[in-house]
Amino acid sequence: MYWGGSLADNKSLRINGSIRVREVRLVDAVGQQCGVVPTPEALRMARDINLDLVEVAPQASPPVCKILDYGKYRFEMGKKLRDSKKRQRLQTLKEVRMQPKINDHDMAFKAKHIQRFLDEGDKVKVTIRFRGRELAHTDLGFNVLQNVLGRLVCGYSVEKQAAMEGRSMSMTLTPKSKK
């Protein structure tokens, strides 16, 4: 039976003596419904098998209570919460910068990094920075971006096409969703 600990972390659940209604709809330890039972009798049934009476649906009329091990129940709920937080990964924006006069090996290296970022589930912003008179040859930057796209393995989609932004040209790639 659950004896200690504060319920400050889980105020919505009432257990054992803190259930203050006259009668409850009872679900026993195996999951079978026992019907509407007076609260003192439900508490006695829970104590007889050395478990707790936990109010799982206080909004229902009458409230639904279940006979279970409260410590184990809290552990399972915490485990579910941790697992859901673990799976909930935020998508971040990574930026890879290049110049229009990029060497072939350097481009392959950058393309490999872009592919890794996409495989990890991140968005990637590919930026070509123009310096000085390179700004007159924006077509070279566009060719570099097309070359990078050609080197990538499928598994991405272009969110924002190549466009000039001041002295740089950028394009945003997103990973395709895994279904």
From Swiss-Prot:
Keyword Acyltransferase tagged: no
InterPro entries: T_IF-3_C_sf (IPR036788), T_IF-3_N_sf (IPR036787), Translation_initiation_fac3_CS (IPR019813), Translation_initiation_fac_3 (IPR001288), Translation_initiation_fac_3_C (IPR019815), Translation_initiation_fac_3_N (IPR019814)
Gene name as annotated: infC
Molecular-function annotations in GO: ribosome binding; translation initiation factor activity
Function: IF-3 binds to the 30S ribosomal subunit and shifts the equilibrium between 70S ribosomes and their 50S and 30S subunits in favor of the free subunits, thus enhancing the availability of 30S subunits on which protein synthesis initiation begins.
Family: Belongs to the IF-3 family.
Protein name stated in the entry: Translation initiation factor IF-3
Keyword Cytoplasm: yes
UniProt main location, coarse: cytoplasm
Subunit structure: Monomer.
Any one Gene Ontology cellular component term annotated for this protein: cytosol
Record's keyword terms, sorted: Cytoplasm, Initiation factor, Protein biosynthesis
One of the protein's GO biological processes: ribosome disassembly
Intrachain S-S bonds: none
Compartment list: Cytoplasm
Spans through the membrane: none
